[in-house]
Amino acid sequence: MKQITGGVTAAKGFQAASTAAGIKYKDRKDMAMIYSEVPCKAAGTFTTNIVKAAPVKWDHNVVYNSKAAQAVVVNAGIANACTGEEGMGYCRQTAEKVEKVLGIAVDEVLVASTGVIGMQLPIDRICNGIDAMVPLLKGDTGSGTEASKAIMTTDTKNKEVAVTIEIGGKTVTIGGMCKGSGMIHPNMCTMLSFVTTDAAISKELLQEALSADVQDTYNMISVDGDTSTNDTCLLLANGLAENPEITEKNADYEEFCKALNFVNETLAKKMAGDGEGATALFEVKIIGAESKEQAKVLSKSVITSSLTKVAIYGHDANWGRILCAMGYSGAAFDPEKVDLFFESAAGKMQIIKNGVAVDYSEEEATRILSEPAVTAIADIKMGNASATAWGCDLTYDYVKINADYRS
């Protein structure tokens, strides 16, 4: 596997465009489009929040009931959530506009929205945005990058990644982009993720690969514990790499899954590290667990602990908060057997041994915790399973950003 420059346009046959449609923001792009030269197999995972935005309902129907998908239209600024039948109508009108200008069937158009809940979409601006983007569709790296910028809301940086692998003597590319900074606690931030590949793979295995991988990537991140109404991850495969089609769980499938995991994990970590107001990526590894599920529950409990997140912001080795968060997670373990370590680019040090603090240097701990990426490793000595979760520190700016979000 080789990491390359680019995102959603890295794979053969995929193009992207973006524009400033004036949906909510001024003087910045707020719409993006992804287009495949040929119809794609489509897979998707969506929010588990009972309150589902109109685009989530629309895309779920396209992914599970349509034979193919060929375009994705994304807007930032307004979520099109809690908008009733009118909101669903806007999804259809968006798809009908794409059908008119690109000749794609309505049920092969995916839509996604992110932004303020409860506001109706300015559909005329959406349609005008589509008109503006179609002539701009290109397969170059820059177009993909600009699209990744256009879907941002409170994000401070765009997020994209791409890799190539060899399958059956053919080069297969997987690329993706995402947005997410606040309301990030997927269970499938506001999290939108779009992954494209030129791999030839059956729709069934494409969906299975995505559903399984989401559990270990996007579902293992949290910024603020809020599961969005709009969380969506879409994976499109157009087959233009011309590799032997992957129709069974063989070595080719495993290679594809490894590359997909790299793309999704990279995007997930980019979202966690770009949490609203965040200054540090906070990674929690639980090792020595009895089961992977036990390790997942423990690690996610720690990254969602507000007191722990504040301690990371303060570069404070307040290990009691970590042990406390593990204790109320609901997962059984013996606290008197836990070893805890902090690690970063500045070094690694043990903080507790068998549930009791060791003699460590607070100054050294502060130095380790002052890096932009910090890891806490807890060994619970019950087995050989492990899991990793990603979050961020909690700062004053998080409150400021969200207090002013609608203004």
Protein language model features and the residues they cover:
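Generic structural marker for isolated residues within well-ordered, non-membrane alpha-helices
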Residues: 95
